[in-house]
A protein has these predicted regions:
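Short alpha-helix adjacent to the SAM-binding motif of class I
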Residues: 70, 77, 98-105
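Short pre-active-site segment immediately N-terminal to redox-active cysteine/selenocysteine motifs
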Residues: 54-56, 61-64, 128
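N-terminal targeting signals for export/organelle localization
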Residues: 1-38, 143-153
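A short beta-strand-turn-helix
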Residues: 36-56
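Thiol-based oxidoreductase modules, predominantly thioredoxin-like and allied folds used
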Residues: 86-98, 109-118
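Solvent-exposed loop/turn segments at secondary-structure junctions
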Residues: 62-66, 94-98, 119, 148-149
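Short, internal strand/loop/helix patches
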Residues: 104-137
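Conserved redox-active cysteine motifs that mediate thiol-disulfide chemistry
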Residues: 60-76
Length: 153
């Protein structure tokens, strides 16, 4: 997971202050753009993310998965830098009560936390977690990183 996060951070830092763009999505990305990104926030309200203002990093995670529990504090530590160029959202696919307990005990409240919907998971073919996806402002997938990659490889 640390290597996955490192790749995402590298991607974020490399595009920071750069006028270059990524012309084509990665090979592992979905073939079409998403029309909307809707999730449930921690109060139960459905939120439609504005993808047009800047690129969006979405991390699909679960509080019961150790590698996810390692990644989110690291993501939150680097949030100030990443959020200069990216909307950042962590969407849980786990029990709301246990997720919110874990979040309150392990995070500082800076990272936007929500819950993925079955429609969103189906449209993006999310079958497990952690999965990190970076969306361009047109809804196309620029980067899709699956699971844990040992940092010593």
């Amino acid at each position: 997971m640390r290597k996955s996060l490192a790749l995402i951070l590298l991607f974020a830092f490399c595009s920071y202050g750069s006028d270059s763009t990524i012309d084509e999505p990665t090979q592992s990305s979905a073939s079409s753009n998403i029309k909307e990104l809707v999730y449930e926030d921690t109060t139960g309200t459905m939120v439609n993310v504005d993808l047009t203002n800047k690129k969006t990093l979405v991390v699909f995670w679960a509080d019961y998965w150790g590698i996810c529990r390692e990644e989110l504090p690291l993501l939150e530590e680097n949030l100030a830098t990443i959020s200069e160029n990216y909307n950042v959202i962590a969407l849980a696919h786990s029990n709301k009560n246990s997720t919110m307990t874990w979040v309150s005990e392990n995070l500082n409240g800076e990272l936007e936390i929500g819950f993925s919907t079955s429609e969103l998971r189906d449209s993006l073919k999310i079958i497990g977690q952690p999965i990190s996806i970076i969306f361009d402002t047109d809804g196309s997938i620029l980067l899709r990183e699956y699971g844990y990659v040992p940092s010593d490889l």
